[in-house]
Amino acid sequence: VKATIENIRIAEQDRSYNSYVLAQKAGQAFPSIFTDYWHYHPEIEITYIVKGKGLAFIGNKTIEFEPGQAFLLGPYLPHNFVSTEEEDVQMEKECWGLQFTQEWLNSFKESASLQRLFRAMSYGINLGQFNPAEHQAFTTIVGKDPLRSIGAFFNLMAMIADRPDFLTVSTNNAYSNVMSQKLSRRMERVSKYIQDHY
C-alpha cells in the first residue's frame, strides 16, 4: 500500500496557510489522533507535539517523539505519528500543526534567507523541544487573530532559520512526489505492527 496523498485545500481557508489543533482527552475512545495514517502532501508542515508520545515515521526513518517536540516536514515527505502507549486510551494527546506552500512563502522576497532551511526540510527536521518563545509564537499562530497570527508565523520561521544547524531525520529527501512501493509497503507493515502490539 502506498502512502496516501492528503488534500489540504489551503485556498479554501480564510488564511494563507492552514493551522490546526488536534486534542484527545484521557479516556476518549479511539481512533487516536496519533494513528496509522502514512501520508504526504505538497505543503510544508510543522508538527508540534504538545501532549502524548510515540513514534514518528518520517521518510525512511523512525524516531521517538515526546511532549514539547516539533518537526518540520518538507513537501511530499511521507510521514506518520503513532502513539505507542500501552494504555493509549488513558493518555492525553494534543498536536498542533501548521501547513503552507513553499510557493506562498517564496512570494515574499524576504524569504530568500530561508533557502538553507528549505534544503534541510526536504529530509525532515527534528526541531527538538520548542523553547518558550517558539511555543508562544505557535500559540499565537493557532489563535483566532489573523493579523497577530501571520506576524507570529514569520517570527517562528525566523527563529527556526536562525538555528546554527538542523537535525535532519530521513536519509532520503522528499521523494519525487511518490516514494518507492517497496519502502511504502514496509513502513505500512511497521506502522500496523505498532498499532496491533502497543
Where are these regions (language model features)?
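Short, charged/polar surface micro-motifs in flexible loops or helix N-caps
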Residues: 52-53, 76-79, 101-105
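Generic protein-terminus/edge-of-domain signal
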Residues: 1-66
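Conserved metal-binding segment of the jelly-roll/cupin
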Residues: 58, 65-85
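Amphipathic alpha-helical segments enriched in hydrophobic/aromatic residues interleaved with Lys/Arg
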Residues: 102-157
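Residue-level recognition of the GNAT/N-acetyltransferase active site
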Residues: 59, 101, 195
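Short, Lys/Arg-enriched, Trp-marked, Pro/Gly-tolerant hinge/linker segments that flank
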Residues: 125-129, 142-197
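Ligand-binding loop in jelly-roll beta-barrel domains
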Residues: 76-96, 109
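Active-site-flanking beta-strand signature of metal-NTP-handling nucleotidyl enzymes
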Residues: 48, 96-98
